[in-house]
Amino acid sequence: MPSISIIVPVLNEATCLDSLLVQLKDWRNDRDEVIFVDGGSEDASRKMILAAGFRLIKSEPGRAKQLNQGAMAAKGDVLWFLHADSDISEISRESFLSLAHNEGFWGFFKIKISDKALIFRIMAFFMNCRASCTRVATGDQGIFVSKSTFIEVGAYSDIKLMEDIELSC
């Protein structure tokens, strides 16, 4: 059974970290790991992560740099990239591994926006349709990839925006 490395880039995310920190406690086990990569937070982000007992790596700012640094430090067979405001409450290790096995070397989850306003439900619907039809994913969708494939494709490009879309193309 493959091991999973969950990688979360952070930069001043204290206002949205609480929920993810609680959810990630369920992912602690002998095989898997959670790595937060901080790009120079000036708020309580680092303190919160360390108080929750998670691994924290310091990095230069820039999401691609942070994601790549976390990936290179990761020990898992599968890399799962999350955002600090991700909601993984409905994803179990078993369901994750089932999807990862079915998708092959990489994949993503449907986006779920917590705001129930109609406009956000419409946005989520169209983002999920686009991703399903084109296989182009955003980081909000929890991209996962085997570590060997990630290295083979050259990791995330060091660009300021859309590094997630570039990786999935």
Predicted stretch roles:
Residues 79:
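Short aromatic/hydrophobic "clamp" motif used to bind/position activated sugar donors
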Residues 58-74:
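Glycine-rich, basic loop-to-helix element that forms the pyrophosphate-binding segment
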Residues 149-153, 159-169:
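A short, conserved alpha-helix in the catalytic core of glycosyltransferases
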Residues 15-19, 43-51:
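Acidic helix N-cap motif at the loop->helix transition within catalytic regions
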Residues 22-31:
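Short, acidic, metal-binding catalytic loop of nucleotide-sugar glycosyltransferases
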Residues 91-119:
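Conserved donor NDP-sugar-binding/catalytic core segment of glycosyltransferases
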Residues 38-46, 86-87:
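A conserved acidic beta->alpha catalytic loop
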Residues 2-5, 33, 166:
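Cell-envelope/extracellular polymer assembly enzymes that use nucleotide-activated donors
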